[in-house]
């Protein structure tokens, strides 16, 4: 049946900020859905609070709202836009929960809006653990023995039925939030309490453990005529007990017999029918008992998910696009398969003639206090995918694509005890310990016994380890063409061969080139080569025939950002996509290189050609060897491609835009100082120390407080602010190893300075300022973690003009061609330069949305040789409204981690709020970050002595807005002396009931708590902040943030919703 004509306007709900468990895969699905529905002539209205997404670009939907995804706000949008239908399956758990809220609160009924893609009942049946279990029983499928509970008493009674270890799963959450595995009574109670808090329906499933069973997923698409296809089967390398988002996964499934596969295929289709998903994609998870083959259903997601993004990239079948079209009435046989140029219908099940491996990327180095053991609660922040002709090849490519410094099975430990521990209690790099076990002489049975990983996978790794052990006894000269080719076919990188044969990577590359041994490139075509494909979606392998068929057009290659991690996320992918779009418009053929399956940049139609490859020097040079591009852009993917700039340059690659030398001048401390000196610009006093004694001596010259950091940071405990010599010595002892090669940098810390971020574009002849952002949190907090306002909300015009002048001078002095970001600190009217990055920064998408000017596109054309003047870009756009960017943090996933912000970045994502005043924009940004700000209630205040005078006006303002105040003794005494009525409450160590009790009992509406020194944070403050986080109480740990909050609460009652298109209209 063709599409529906009874609906005209469709509202798509996005996923909001990037958090653990919900990353940029939903930008990919949402962007596809917008394109698909507009193609069909529908009017598309979009709501998403995340400005760093492609889907919120003003030309993706007809009307775009960057507003909080919360049912009251969405109701205002529905009232204004009057959509006929809502598509809630493209925005992860956030969108599903919002759609259910709209239904429960009568909004859908009131405005006569229907849900398409998944009905209320289907969502509820899949997400409500109790109903799902009943539905499975009805169709004769087993689920683990389990009980639905709503109180701790019920949960404990259920536990005695299922025994330890016990699985605890909250309802209506994603990424396993709040859940876990309990091995004893104490852990059980702790996880249950956390789980009840996490579940919006206060409901848990207490489940029998199937730890050690094999885990599989099926990606299913169904249409309303009941046609079903399996897009992809996925097998988890890690057995049950590790969240699938934290598991290494392989597609297609490797260890199922054909009969088992057919049984699972039929079961997954039956699940969709019973749940009632009648249009679109779902994923169904199964577990199989390796002892006897018993199969059970674990859960299903009635929406596109992280796995469906992976399945789309693994097969080339665009699940989200197809699901969007099915939701408006099409059937699978009416849709064509794009990748084959429409030769076959979408009802053909994809078949693949290669192996895909996904490996998760973790960020535990940012959270040293976090527990890095993997359980049913997801902890990874990103992932990398690789393709090869064999599992071994794709696994080795994925490992080197992670960018964690490994290029193969690098040795972690030779201690049998340590290895046993790591095999049985998985952490982020268990696979390397599997290799170590074989290296240390463990048998296959022993490794299987401890790890429960399927023997088929273990044999593959054992074989690679034996290859490595043999290679260590040889030299590079010993290897002939046949042996080198055999190693390359198993996925060994030049770098790993060099390490094992004790030679240089360049020597291995030169030998390979002299033997004319290069990879060939194969196409991803959904049909295993059965039909021809014009789509250049390619991966490398060492075989005979190359399918790349490069053109002789003028082309530019863009290097992407690799796996998401903290500090390098979706913002950089956004810039890469924009570069590709702009250069295509300018008439170039564009080539994208990236290995992140979640992103829009790795969509097969974003660029003319896509190479799904790791971003290492070897892999990039091989693609350049085949494609011979006119130029390469390294400035848009964050640190990943930037690190390759010098080596690419040395290998004769033409880097367009800002040169490798200019990048180095900005990054090299001493060269940069000389430039600032020449321009008469100020920097905070700084010194470089090469040993501990020197550091203590130089610290006196610089003056405390200091920001200390190693000059060469490899993750790790990078930066700290130290207030005295004891803290400095402790940092030197514990955090860093200092030497001549890796000195330590000491900067004077500007206390209570205002930090300012500037993005600009320079074409060599002129500089155009993109935007000036004033940070809300004081300097010393990482710019990626601080909220910021565009335009600035309290900087004087003189200071802003001087910042503009200094920015332009530095851009010219560095010879920038393209984007540049500068961070300044302003203290008592004096401007200091903190750092300069001659590349795309993480604020580019935010500035582009706030000013209506697509900076990344403009700069890409500058890099390709088109001046700003020729593009008609002149002067700065200063909007007549305020935009505030706020950071979103993953603290709730890491019990034990303090929420205090510092110079080390820890946020995973961002949101944006827009308002006619700074206060309105700030409030909307807080709501967008899922903060609950009540209109009434008690505010708890506890600040250090230095902050007390600044607290006074805040306390008065909150009181005038109708809040009650309570404080610890010192703060209360100060406020009372100045005539503010406040109730006194005990500190944690002053007896019960204390502040933590009050927070847990729901008596506190908001907490304002600043830190003093290091010792106190460990005890009182930490307990207060942690309990506020767990009880979802709004928490401010900086006074600047508290000031902004106090000024904005008046907007709680009523704030407007503004569409991006209307805002940009005002700028003309």
Curated annotation (Swiss-Prot):
Question: What EC number(s) does the entry state?
Answer: 6.3.4.16, 6.3.5.5
Q: Which reaction is this enzyme known to catalyze?
A: hydrogencarbonate + L-glutamine + 2 ATP + H2O = carbamoyl phosphate + L-glutamate + 2 ADP + phosphate + 2 H(+)
Q: Where does Mn(2+) 2 bind?
A: 299, 301
The record lists Mn(2+) 4 as bound by: 835, 837
- Positions of the region Oligomerization domain? 404-548
Q: Which residues bind Mn(2+) 1?
A: 285, 299
Q: Tell me the keywords, alphabetical order.
A: Amino-acid biosynthesis, Arginine biosynthesis, ATP-binding, Ligase, Magnesium, Manganese, Metal-binding, Nucleotide-binding, Pyrimidine biosynthesis, Repeat
The protein's name: Carbamoyl phosphate synthase large chain
């Amino acid at each position: 049946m063709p599409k529906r004509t009874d609906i005209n306007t469709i509202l798509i709900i996005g996923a909001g900020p990037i958090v653990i468990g919900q990353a940029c895969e939903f930008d990919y699905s949402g962007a596809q859905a917008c394109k698909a529905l507009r193609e069909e002539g529908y009017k598309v209205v979009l709501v998403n609070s995340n400005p760093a997404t492609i889907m919120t670009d003003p030309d993706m939907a007809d009307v775009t709202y960057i507003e909080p995804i919360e049912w009251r706000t969405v109701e205002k949008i529905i009232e204004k836009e009057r959509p006929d239908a809502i598509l809630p399956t493209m925005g992860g758990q956030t969108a599903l929960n919002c759609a259910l809220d709209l239904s429960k609160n009568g909004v859908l009924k009131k405005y006569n809006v229907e849900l398409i893609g998944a009905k209320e009942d289907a969502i509820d049946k899949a997400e409500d653990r109790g109903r799902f279990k009943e539905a499975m029983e009805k169709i004769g499928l087993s689920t683990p023995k389990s009980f639905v509970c709503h109180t701790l008493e019920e949960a404990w009674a259920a536990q005695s039925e299922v025994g330890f270890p016990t699985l605890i799963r909250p309802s209506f959450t994603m990424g396993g939030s709040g859940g876990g595995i309990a091995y004893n009574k104490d852990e059980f109670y702790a996880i249950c309490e956390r789980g009840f808090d996490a579940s919006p329906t206060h409901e848990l499933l207490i489940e029998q453990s199937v730890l050690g069973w094999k885990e599989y997923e099926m990606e299913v698409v169904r249409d309303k005529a009941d046609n079903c296809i399996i897009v992809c089967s996925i097998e988890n390398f890690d057995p049950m007990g590790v969240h699938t988002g934290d598991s290494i996964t392989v597609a297609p499934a490797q260890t199922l017999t054909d009969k088992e596969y057919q049984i699972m295929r039929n079961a997954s289709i039956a699940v969709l029918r019973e749940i009632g998903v009648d249009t679109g994609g779902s994923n169904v998870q199964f577990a199989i008992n390796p002892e006897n083959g018993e199969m059970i259903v674990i859960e299903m997601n009635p929406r596109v998910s992280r796995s469906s993004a992976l399945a789309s990239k693994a097969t080339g079948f665009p699940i989200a696009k197809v699901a969007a079209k099915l939701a408006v009435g099409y059937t699978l046989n009416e849709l064509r398969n794009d990748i084959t140029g429409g030769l076959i219908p979408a009802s053909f099940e994809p078949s693949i003639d290669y192996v895909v491996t996904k490996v998760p990327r973790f960020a535990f180095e940012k959270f040293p206090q976090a527990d890095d053991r993997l359980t049913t609660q997801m902890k990874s922040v990103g992932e990398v995918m690789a393709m090869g002709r064999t599992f071994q090849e794709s696994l080795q490519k994925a490992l080197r694509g992670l960018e964690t410094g490994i290029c193969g099975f690098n040795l972690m430990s030779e201690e049998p005890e340590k290895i046993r521990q790591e095999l049985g209690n998985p952490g982020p790099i268990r696979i390397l310990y599997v290799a170590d076990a074989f290296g240390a002489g463990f048998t296959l049975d022993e490794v299987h016994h401890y790890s429960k990983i399927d023997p088929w996978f273990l044999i593959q790794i054992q074989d690679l380890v034996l290859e490595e052990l043999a290679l260590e006894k040889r030299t590079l000269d010993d290897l002939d063409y046949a042996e080198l080719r055999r190693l390359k076919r198993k996925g060994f990188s030049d770098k790993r061969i060099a390490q094992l044969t004790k030679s240089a990577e360049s020597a291995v590359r030169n030998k390979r080139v002299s033997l004319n041994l290069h990879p060939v490139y194969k196409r991803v075509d959904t049909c295993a080569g059965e039909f021809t494909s014009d789509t250049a979606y390619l991966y490398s392998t060492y075989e005979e025939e190359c399918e790349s068929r490069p053109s002789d057009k003028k082309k530019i290659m863009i290097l992407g950002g690799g796996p998401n991690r903290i500090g390098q996320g979706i913002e950089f992918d956004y810039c890469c996509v924009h570069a590709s779009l702009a250069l295509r418009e300018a008439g170039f053929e564009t080539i994208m290189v990236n290995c992140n399956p979640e992103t829009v940049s790795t969509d097969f139609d974003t660029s003319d050609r896509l190479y799904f490859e790791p971003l290492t020097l070897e892999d990039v040079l091989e693609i350049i060897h085949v494609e011979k591009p006119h130029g390469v852009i390294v400035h848009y993917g964050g640190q990943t491609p930037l690190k390759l700039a010098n080596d690419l340059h040395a290998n004769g690659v033409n880097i367009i835009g800002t040169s490798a030398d200019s990048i180095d001048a900005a990054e090299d401390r001493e060269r940069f100082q000389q430039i600032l000196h020449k321009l008469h610009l100020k920097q905070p006093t700084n010194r470089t120390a090469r040993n501990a004694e020197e550091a203590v001596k130089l610290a006196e010259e610089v003056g405390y407080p200091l920001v200390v950091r190693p000059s060469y940071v490899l993750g790790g405990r990078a930066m700290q602010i130290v207030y005295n010599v004891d803290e400095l010595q402790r940092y030197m002892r514990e955090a860093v190893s200092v030497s001549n090669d890796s000195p330590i940098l000491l900067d004077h810390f500007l206390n209570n300075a205002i930090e300012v971020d500037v993005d600009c574009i320079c074409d060599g002849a002129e500089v155009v300022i993109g935007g000036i952002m004033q940070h809300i949190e004081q300097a010393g907090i990482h710019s990626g973690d601080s909220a910021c306002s565009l335009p600035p909300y309290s900087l004087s015009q003189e200071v802003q003009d001087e910042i503009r002048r200094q920015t332009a001078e530095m851009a010219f002095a560095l010879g920038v061609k393209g984007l540049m970001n500068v961070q300044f600190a302003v203290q008592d009217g004096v401007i200091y330069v903190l750092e300069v990055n001659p590349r795309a920064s993480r604020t580019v998408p935010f500035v582009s949305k706030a000013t209506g000017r697509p900076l990344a596109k403009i700069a890409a054309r500058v890099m390709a040789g088109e001046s700003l003047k020729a593009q008609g870009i002149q002067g700065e756009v200063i909007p007549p409204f305020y935009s505030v960017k706020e950071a979103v943090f993953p603290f709730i996933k890491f019990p034990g981690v303090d929420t205090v912000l510092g110079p080390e970045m820890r946020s995973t994502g961002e949101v944006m709020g827009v308002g006619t005043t700074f206060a309105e924009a700030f409030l909307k940004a807080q709501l967008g970050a899922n903060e609950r700000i009540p209109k009434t209630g008690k505010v708890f205040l506890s600040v250090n002595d230095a902050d007390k005078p600044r607290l006074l006006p805040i306390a008065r303002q909150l009181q005038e807005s109708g809040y009650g105040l309570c404080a610890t003794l010192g703060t209360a005494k100060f406020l009372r002396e100045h005539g503010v009525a406040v109730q006194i409450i005990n500190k944690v160590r002053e007896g019960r009931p204390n502040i933590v009790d009050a927070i847990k009992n729901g008596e506190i509406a908001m907490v304002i708590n600043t830190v003093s020194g290091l010792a106190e944070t460990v005890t009182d403050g930490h307990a207060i902040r942690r309990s506020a986080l767990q009880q979802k109480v709004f928490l401010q740990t900086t006074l600047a943030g508290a000031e902004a909050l106090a000024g904005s609460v008046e907007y709680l009652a009523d704030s407007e919703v503004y569409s991006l298109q209307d805002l940009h209209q005002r700028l003309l």
